Every structure is written in structure tokens, then in C-alpha cells.
Curated annotation (Swiss-Prot):
Encoding gene per record: Slc11a1
InterPro entries on file: NRAMP_fam
Keyword Transmembrane in record: yes
GO cellular component, one term: endosome membrane
Transmembrane annotation, as ranges: 40-60, 124-144, 153-173, 200-220, 246-266, 306-326, 354-374, 392-412, 423-443, 452-472
Family classification: Belongs to the NRAMP family.
GO biological processes: antigen processing and presentation of peptide antigen; cadmium ion transmembrane transport; cellular detoxification of cadmium ion; defense response to bacterium; defense response to Gram-negative bacterium; defense response to protozoan; establishment of localization in cell; inflammatory response
Glycan attachment positions: N280, N294
Keyword Amino-acid biosynthesis among UniProt keywords: no
Protein name: Natural resistance-associated macrophage protein 1
Topology term for the membrane: Multi-pass membrane protein
HAMAP family on file: NRAMP (MF_00221)
Length: 507
């Protein structure tokens, strides 16, 4: 049976083959909705709704694998990466996940700054909104001191706000239900080009945050499972799968509300038309943000709130801003816990949540303040969209390790991935990697100066090299013996680095 843990956990033998190794005590669980819509993807038509649907399905598959790994082995993904990957790939992998966490926190800072700007009718400048996010950091830590239940209640409150606010926008916009269903279940995108590719990659990055895969593998450890009994392990896996399905369904509905509203409001809308709509509304002061030309409106989270207010009244703008604020606060909570688990798992370095959130927020605020002070709103909102793409680009560094270790029978025993699961997840992962690679190649010609090519080339080599290494070890774990090198037999036989080196030394 699954039950809440007592403060002191009694060590007992686990069902997974590596679970008898020492593991840090699990932390309290902040929330189980780890993939909930923390970022808002905004395409301008319903053509990409099918990307949202399948990204959510992929998110469920990833969350299922992460939970199963944690339940069976008693260890999170970061800890198992520490056991099996050599030092250099392990450090590089840790850095990529830390980059994803900082990128996610930057999005929280951007969303919060824009929401304060909208709620104050522009009286709070963007840089002021960025600095205000320091306060919400301490508010989160304040709640954390009052225990897990208070934190979960606050997270539930944020989720409710998001559902109500974005649901309100959906009702007042009244999008076409026929177009909605067609966009969801008929994968197509006629006439799409690089902007739509950017949106599609951003949707995947907004739905599946790489660090959340590491987080969810750790959260399941906050429940006591008797790993000596196969029935209890199987029951726990089903329990967490059901829980993840419910959470992702809520996430999907919230994202669907947002994307459907903007597909309705912005489809084939020109900047001139948007300017005229706002100029003839009670929010005429905002009309100047739209250039007076015939180009199609390029929607971001700031312009999105403005045009909603111009079309449906000021209430729609303020409700959008409140929903944006709630989405940002949920990101702070999950990012803090993910950062702590990742640091402890990869580096065996224990920091307090206060120190961890202070480090992450400091790294996120500096570049965001610089953009807010020296650039304009469009650059800040555009930065948010690029950060969504960054999350998608970093996704292989979470999905490839989880596919590797959940496919190793020596680690997962009878709960290792079956052949059908391996084929489906591997094909999806190959597709994601191919799309990311195509995006990187197509993005190169748009670089503002040739001097950037050298830096981008170095980053691309490092990115492709680490991805290739992770894919190689994943193939070994899937049974490709012909790829096995003597130094990496652990991925075939499930021997942690220390144990393999010990055997080689004694031999």
C-alpha cells in the first residue's frame, strides 16, 4: 500500500537492483502537477493545436517513466545519472539541466513583470516588475516554512486561478468548436514556415520542461512503498500514473483555453487592424504598441493581453494578467525543488531551499533586468518565446537518460520498458531531436552578425556531442551489444561505475 512517510524513514531492501545503495532522504513533495502549464504557448491559429495534444501525450509518457524509475529504484534520475555516467558527461548534463531551470525562472520573472505592468496600466515599469519578483521568492520560502500542506494549498490556489482566468477568456472569445476539434485531431499545417516551426518547438518546450522530469522522479519518493513486494510496486506505479493523467488533463485544458482564444482573436489579423481595434476601444492608449502596417500580428504574452482587452473589455486584460501572474508563481515553486533535487543527485551537494532559490533567481534576474532596462516590451516578450524554444532544445538531456535507465532490466527488473514502449518512445524522441536539429540549422542564417557564427558553432558541437553520447548509451541500454565498449558495459549489465571499476581492479 502507498502511504505518507513518517519523518524518519526505515531503510529496507528495495526491489530495484541498485536501490540498496545509500540515497539522500527524500524531500517533502511540493506538488504532483509537475507538468502543469507554467508557460503560455501562443500560436496565432488553431493549426498547431495537434502539437499541443501530442506534446501533452509525450509529457505523460515521460512522467510515467520518471515516476516508475523513482518507485522501483528508490532513487531519482539525478542520483542514477551520478551512478552510471562518467564525470565529464555527468557534469555537462548537470549544467544543461541547470540552464533549463534558470531559463524557466527567467520566464517566471518575465511573466510576472509583464503582469504587473498590465495590472498597473503601465505605471510599474518592466524593470520594476522584475525587481518585485525578488519579493515573491521570499513569500514562497515563507510558505515553505509553514509545512507541506500550506504549500500544496497555495499551489492548488494558483492552479484554480489559472483555470478560472483562462477559462473566462475562452468563454468571452467563443472560438469555433469545429475549428478547435479539427486543429486537435487532424495534424496538418498548410502554408506554415519557419515562424510556425518556432511556435511548434516552443509549444513542446512549454509543455514538457526538462527539469520537471528529474523533479517528478524525486517527488514519488515522498510516498512510502514496500519495494520488497512486487504487488505494492505495481500498485504505486498505477497510482502515480493515474495522478499524472489527471494533472496533465488539467494542464491540457488550460493550455487549450489559451491557444483557442488566441487562435480566434488573432487569426489573419494585421497590425493595422489591431491598431484600429485598440484605438476605438477604452484601452486606446495601448494602440501604439501595434505598428501601422499590413504585416500579420506577431503575438506575444504582452500583446496578447492587450488585444484581449481591446476586443472584450478591460476586464479581459486584467484577468489575463492575473492568470499570467499565477502561472509564473507556480514556476517558482517547481523550479526551486527541481534545482535542489538536481544538485543533490548529480553533485551530492546539499543546499537549503533558501540558498538554492536565491542562486537561481539571481542568475535569472540579471539578464532579464538588462533586457527590461535597455530594450522594450517586444524584446522581453520575444525573449520569453525563445526561452520556450530553449526548453525544447534541452529536452533530449532529460528524455534520453530516462529512456536509458528505464530500459535496463538490471535496474528496473520486470518493470523495464517493453519492446513496444521502447519503439514508441524512441521514435518520438528521434522526432523531437530531428525537429530541434532542423530548427538550429534554419536559425543560423538569421544571426545578426557573422561574429556570432563561431560561438554558435562551438555551442552546436557541444550540444550534438553530448546528445550523441546520450543516444549511444541509450542504444546500449536498449540491447545494442555491438555498440558496447568495455568502459560502458554498465549500460548493458546494470553495473554502477564504482562497482564496474571495482571488478576491473580486482580482475
Amino acid at each position: 500500500m502507498i502511504r505518507d512517510k513518517n519523518p524518519q524513514r526505515v531503510n529496507r531492501p528495495s526491489y530495484g537492483s541498485i536501490s540498496s545503495l545509500p540515497s539522500p532522504a527524500p524531500q517533502p513533495e511540493p506538488s504532483r502537477n509537475t507538468y502543469l502549464s507554467e508557460k503560455i504557448p501562443i500560436p496565432s491559429t488553431e493549426q498547431l493545436l495537434w502539437v499541443l495534444l501530442w506534446a501533452t501525450v509525450l509529457g505523460l509518457l515521460c512522467q510515467r517513466l520518471a515516476a516508475r524509475l523513482g518507485v522501483v529504484t528508490g532513487k531519482d534520475l539525478g542520483e542514477i545519472c551520478h551512478l552510471y555516467y562518467p564525470k565529464v558527461p555527468r557534469i555537462l548534463l548537470w549544467l544543461t539541466i541547470e540552464l533549463a531551470i534558470v531559463g524557466s525562472d527567467m520566464q517566471e520573472v518575465i511573466g510576472t513583470a509583464i503582469s504587473f505592468n498590465l495590472l498597473s496600466a503601465g505605471r510599474i515599469p518592466l524593470w520594476g516588475g522584475v525587481l518585485i519578483t525578488i519579493v515573491d521568492t521570499f513569500f514562497f520560502l515563507f510558505l515553505d516554512n509553514y509545512g507541506l500542506r500550506k504549500l500544496e494549498a497555495f499551489f492548488g490556489f494558483l492552479v484554480t486561478i489559472m483555470a478560472l482566468t483562462f477559462g473566462y477568456e475562452y468563454v468571452v472569445a467563443r472560438p469555433s468548436q469545429g475549428a478547435l476539434l479539427k486543429g486537435l485531431f487532424l495534424p496538418s499545417c498548410p502554408g506554415c514556415g519557419q515562424p510556425e516551426l518556432l511556435q511548434a518547438v516552443g509549444i513542446v518546450g512549454a509543455i514538457i520542461m526538462p527539469h520537471n522530469i528529474y523533479l517528478h522522479s524525486a517527488l514519488v519518493k515522498s510516498r512510502e512503498v514496500d519495494r520488497t513486494r512486487r504487488g505494492d510496486v505495481r500498485e504505486a506505479n498505477m497510482y502515480f500514473l493515474t495522478e499524472a493523467t489527471i494533472a496533465l488533463f488539467v494542464s491540457f485544458i488550460i493550455n487549450l483555453f489559451v491557444m483557442a482564444v488566441f487562435g480566434q482573436a488573432f487569426y489573419q489579423q494585421t497590425n493595422e487592424e489591431a491598431f484600429n481595434i485598440c484605438a476605438n476601444s477604452s484601452l486606446h492608449n495601448y494602440a501604439k504598441i501595434f505598428p501601422r502596417d499590413n504585416n500579420t500580428v506577431s503575438v506575444d504574452i504582452y500583446q496578447g493581453g492587450v488585444i484581449l482587452g481591446c476586443l472584450f473589455g478591460p476586464a479581459a486584460l486584467y484577468i489575463w494578467a492575473v492568470g499570467l501572474l499565477a502561472a509564473g508563481q507556480s514556476s517558482t515553486m517547481t523550479g526551486t525543488y527541481a534545482g535542489q533535487f538536481v544538485m543533490e543527485g548529480f553533485l551530492k551537494l546539499r543546499w537549503s531551499r533558501f540558498a538554492r532559490v536565491l542562486l537561481t533567481r539571481s542568475c535569472a534576474i540579471l539578464p532579464t533586468v538588462l533586457v527590461a532596462v535597455f530594450r522594450d516590451l517586444r524584446d522581453l516578450s520575444g525573449l520569453n518565446d525563445l526561452l520556450n524554444v530553449l526548453q525544447s532544445l534541452l529536452l533530449p538531456f532529460a528524455v534520453l537518460p530516462i529512456l536509458t535507465f528505464t530500459s535496463m532490466p538490471a535496474v528496473m527488473q520486470e518493470f523495464a520498458n517493453g519492446w513496444l514502449s521502447k519503439v514508441i518512445t524512441s521514435c518520438i524522441m528521434a522526432l523531437v531531436c530531428a525537429i530541434n536539429l532542423y530548427f538550429v540549422i534554419s536559425y543560423l542564417p538569421s544571426l545578426p552578425h557573422p561574429a556570432y557564427f563561431g560561438l554558435v558553432a562551438l555551442l552546436a558541437i557541444g550540444y550534438l556531442g553530448l546528445t550523441a553520447y546520450l543516444a549511444w548509451t541509450c542504444c546500449i541500454a536498449h540491447g545494442a551489444k555491438f555498440l558496447t565498449h568495455s568502459s560502458h558495459q554498465r549500460f548493458l549489465y546494470g553495473l554502477p561505475i564504482e562497482e564496474q571499476e571495482g571488478r576491473e581492479g580486482s580482475g
